[in-house]
Amino acid sequence: KEISKFPNVVKDVAFIVNKKVMSKEIEEVIMAAGGKRLRSVEVFDVYTGENVGINEKSIAYTLTFNDYEKTLSDEEVTNAFNKIIKEVTTKCNAVLRDK
């Protein structure tokens, strides 16, 4: 893979989903929604317990965005990030976790 001369933009996001939903399903939706500038999706935490429903889990991801031709603007990253949230909440019946 080509290495970009431009900086990565890294964002973390967590979703609460039914325990039966597999992380791989969510990752596929994230990658499809993230567009060509989303370079990677990595799970960094899976949580069950307090503040999460009995049949639910929280899965947290680190998303890395980059463009090989320019530095990404805040707006470009925010637009992609918002599309990811919309798609995951709709297609995976997920809730954005705010804490």
List where the protein language model places each region.
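A carboxyl-terminal module marker
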Residues: 1-99
